[in-house]
Amino acid sequence: MTGAPWYHRDISRVRAEELLAHAGIDGSFLVRDSESVPGAYALCLLFQRHVHTYRILPDADGLLAVQATQGVQVNCFRTLGDLVLGYQNPNKGLVAPLLYPVMRESEANDESSDGDDEKPGSTFANSPPRAISPTATSPPSSSAAPHLLLQRLQELSPNSVGCEIVSLLDEYLHGNVCKDLENLKGGASGLQHFQGILSHICDSLHSEIDQTLSSLETLAKVFDHPSGHLTFSTMQNIGKSPEENMDNLLQKLTTLCNLLSSLEKRVLKALQEAVANHNLSLQPATPPESSRAPKKLARPNPVHSFQVKVVRYGRQTVSVDINEGVLLFDKKSGSFGVETVTLDRIVQLVKFQRGPAKLKMVVDSHHNPPRELVFESTKKREAFCRLLQLMKTTHSQKSELDVISVFVGTWNMGGTPPPGSLQSWVTCSGLGLTPDESISSLPHDIYAVGTQDNPQGEREWAEHIRATLRTSTNIDYKQVAVQSLWNIRLAVFVKPEHEARISQVNTASVKTGLGNTLGNKGAVGVSLLFNGTSMGFVNCHLTSGSDKALRRNHNFQDILRLLSLGEKQLSTFDISLRFNHLFWCGDLNYRLDLDALDILKHVSKREFEELMCADQLTRERHKRKAFFNFKEEKIMFPPTYRYERGSRDCYLWQKYKSSGVQVNGPSWCDRVLWKSYPESHVICTSYGCTDDIFTSEHSPVFATFEVGVISLFPRTESCSERASIELEAIEAIVKTSSKAKFFIEFHSRCLEEPRRSAENDSQYCEVPGFLKLGWSSKQLPKLHPVFSDLEHLRDQHLLLSVKSCDGFESYGECCVALRPTAGKLLDTFETCLTHRGEEMGSIRGRFRVYVPPDRRRIRERVYEWLSIEKDEREMMKDQLSPPSSSAFSIKAPSASYVASPNSYTNPAYFIFEEMPVFRKAEEIPSTIKESQVVCANNTVIQLPRVTGSHGHGKRSARRSDFTEIEIPGSLAPYKPSCETQSELSSAASSYQLFPGPHVPSTSPNQRHTTHSSNSSLQLQSHKNNMAPDSELSGKKLTNSYMNHSVFSRDMHKEKVRQDYQGVHQGRPVPIRNGPKLYPYVSTRVPAQCSASWIVEQPTPASGDNSLTALQIAKSLSEVDFQPADKKYPFHQMPSQQRQHGYDYGLASERNYSWEKEVSVLHGAPETVRELLSTLGLQRYTLDLSRSGWDDLDYFSGITEEELCAAGVSNPSHRRRILENLPKIWD
């Protein structure tokens, strides 16, 4: 059964539809495992461009039958093969007979290592390359024997198999076993290659036996008669053949057995003689005094001081006294002395994004002007905020916590024991984003420590970590769980005072090595509930090899789908949607696709941002092939692999083997990522690696997080009214070729049980391969939460799963936060649908949450006390961004093409707003049809070319009418996680779904005219910008996805002039720091590109560079042709600002003139180096940096005396600097 070529085992539904679409013939079919019923199958059949899925269920006797509606006769079959044969004839109940089987894809089971996993001192690294005898010359028995032995190896329990022996056996069974068999037939007396394996395995046993024999001889010398003790000589095994080594080992074992069997008798005889001759007696040992050490208390918090500049008050020293709960402002001058500010007087702290060292403190009242503090560095500011939060938590009157600190670490130990101290790892000391020394020793609430290639046992390793934590924090942490899969381990510890808050602890593991049967690669996981917050921790070791990125993606998808963690009622969802917070760490093994020498050059210059363009994980995340919707903090530390053991001075990127030189360029193999529910509070506070642990080729990596937690016990007093969640309408786009009906399943921890909707009442297939589904309020259930408190509901989430009515298989899942809607009358949501880690579509809806009036009390959280506010440019950008539509309706598709704001070229808009997509040429306006490139967000975007089989008589007999989208070379820019990690942002859709607000005064014809004229304006701007004075080479165009910022400066002058002429009444769009394609790639272009390889890189090799139509939607949704002032009124301010008495944004920024705005957006320096370069005084950069003037905010307050002291001796140069300082202090 399983050997049938049309049986595809556990492939996903989407992959099955893709294979059938590729086949393209009616009657094409395949069979896969059912995703909804264990042990069942799904028969997928292509007919008239649609995939029809039938469920095959086994009965009590094991007979198989296709599930049918009531009243239809059921035909039973013994095997899947019989069932397929039975339905190859027409009129058997299927929509078409099973005519053309779609064959299973060939899988390369090559799990050979690239040298990453070899242990130190292993001779396996120097073994000759694998030699496999040709099939023509090998006898049948020789080829059958290895296959049988490999099957036995796969069936072994992972606990009984060592990681290294797997590699040796794999090597032996794939080649050398055949040679041994042939040698036996040729008259050989032994298995030469097998003896080599035995010799290699027993290499370490020689030294162990020598050490054991030496210890036993010491015992014999002490207790035995001097003339009777045993002597032996250490036998050397170096340079001997495997057979001689085995003989040597057997001799040592014989000696060891003889000594062990006689030593106790010798000692007993010696003791008897000593008692008889010297009248000795054994006295009972006096009981020792209580050796139990007194319980260690956590170290007291000292008073921490910070040097700051307070605007309008000058330099001061601010001290934080956590124990007393006060701030001390020492002005150092004047008669005011030291000012004491108690904790209860601090109303709010506000951090600005563009002022990384600036902090605003609201004291006593929001109506008072806030105090503006500028710290020496961002690290100092973050330490100050952390201490204030700790002080507020310490002195809080509430019994439950609002925020905790979580440590996540990963380290590939390389098969060697760890050093005696791991303190630098658990205290986040080293390179990258590290905490200030004032808070580095503060203990975290939870520690999750993951390792790979760990040679120590579970108990030994866990005790080692606990001892390290005890030494560094003076706290005896409690072990929550330890989970292992071979040498992959994950240990979770918690503070003793939190032990009662931990519940529902689960552990699991998944094998991904050698066809998902061996645990040398795979993942382990631990999940827990901290009060009402669910957390998951995953530690994985993925496939190694620079060219194995696709297999690593598959490893991730298998782990996501198969790791059994969390609540059982959420088993419908993969683990990325089962937890409020999921932390994923491990040796992911994604490499840098770049020459090793180029990598070393950039690492030596600390140009990590440029290297991120070549990082495989970054690329795969952008293509949404792996870790979709996960976040990662900006990497500011050098690659953690592959170092020379014993130091961190150099990378060992070349390995000399008998088969040649193997190159492993430095890479960021060890990573920490996370994914949280929308509107959840989580901030990455550190991300780096150690620089003083040398025992492995990998450096340990650490990350810490500030995580908001939910109270477990809401108020429970009786209430006559219950809260309710009323769903008014939902629309979804699902990536499928099926014609089935669908329903939505709702899950939530605030509901007693899952609820289902009725079948969708509208369904359209306007784009081949996508279904547009709609549910009105009549089809949607009314949900009643268990608890009706607003305080409880604003932390809750709804999990939605779109399932088919025929097979009950999920076609996409998502998470929606109740927080933004609780207490309001109406709100909308929009987000993407995912399944098995892949993007499957999108969904939007409108719902209302009703809370009884007496249950609407809420309290301020500790993390809400410290807010993060965007600066004036960010606020302008938000005000000019498209707001979500407040209402929508489900209508029949319209025949006419009507353009609406922001919906010109986005396929998602066409599907949602009843507009035709690029299907027929006559339906497309000429401005769109002729456009090859458009300008969007400071980037040139190549429009996709959509081809289909709608031509007249051009339909291939082997192809069905599925739309094929050719992906442009310029991928869509997106905002990296590092720019949004500190915001409380929901997991919105990856592409815009809602159109801009409706303009009543504009008729459809006028809107269409406006669209055409504006698109013509943009295209003309592009043509002008491609003039010889700013001409870009073809290489730059083809590689614009790596460094798209090369377009912004070249095209800026002409674009600004034309935009100003065309929309002179509108405000300029602040696009200086537009969204980036890859995280951390600078949008500023230096005079000479420091990373020439970005532009001159050759065309990528052919492979999987595809994006889905949904990703094209995101690319095109960023094209905006409407004037900004007509769509998004500039005067609108966030509601959060209006509700306070004092406007934290700079009011003067609202009155910027056009000329001033252009100069600010495109000429203002962002660093001290840029400012000095603009003034032609870059020679002073190093001297000023050495004197501590490396932060622009801090530098803007410099005086002439301080300039002179820093080395600016020329008076005219000092005057030029002072006259051009940024005006940020007023």
From Swiss-Prot:
Pfam families: C2_SHIP1-2_2nd, C2_SHIP1-2_first, Exo_endo_phos2, SAM_1, SH2. Tyrosine phosphorylated by the members of the SRC family after exposure to a diverse array of extracellular stimuli. The modification Phosphotyrosine is found at residue 909. Residues 1163-1226 form the SAM domain. Phosphatidylinositol (PtdIns) phosphatase that specifically hydrolyzes the 5-phosphate of phosphatidylinositol-3,4,5-trisphosphate (PtdIns(3,4,5)P3) to produce PtdIns(3,4)P2, thereby negatively regulating the PI3K (phosphoinositide 3-kinase) pathways. Plays a central role in regulation of PI3K-dependent insulin signaling, although the precise molecular mechanisms and signaling pathways remain unclear. Part of a signaling pathway that regulates actin cytoskeleton remodeling. Residues 106-144, 945-964, 985-1035 are annotated as: Disordered. Its EC number is 3.1.3.86. Belongs to the inositol 1,4,5-trisphosphate 5-phosphatase family. Residues 6-102 form the SH2 domain. The SH2 domain interacts with tyrosine phosphorylated forms of proteins. The keyword Nucleus applies. The keyword Calcium does not apply. It is a peripheral membrane protein. It is found in: Cytoplasm, Cytosol; Cytoplasm, Cytoskeleton; Membrane; Cell projection, Filopodium. A motif (NPXY motif) lies at residues 906-909. The gene is inppl1b. Residues 127-144, 1011-1025 have a biased composition (Low complexity). Keywords: Actin-binding, Cell adhesion, Cell projection, Cytoplasm, Cytoskeleton, Hydrolase, Immunity, Lipid metabolism, Membrane, Nucleus, Phosphoprotein, SH2 domain, SH3-binding. One of its GO terms (cellular component) is nucleus. Residues 108-117 have a biased composition (Acidic residues). CDD domains: SH2_SHIP. One of its GO terms (molecular function) is actin binding. It catalyses: a 1,2-diacyl-sn-glycero-3-phospho-(1D-myo-inositol-3,4,5-trisphosphate) + H2O = a 1,2-diacyl-sn-glycero-3-phospho-(1D-myo-inositol-3,4-bisphosphate) + phosphate. It comes from Danio rerio (Zebrafish). One of its GO terms (biological process) is negative regulation of insulin-like growth factor receptor signaling pathway. This is Phosphatidylinositol 3,4,5-trisphosphate 5-phosphatase 2B.
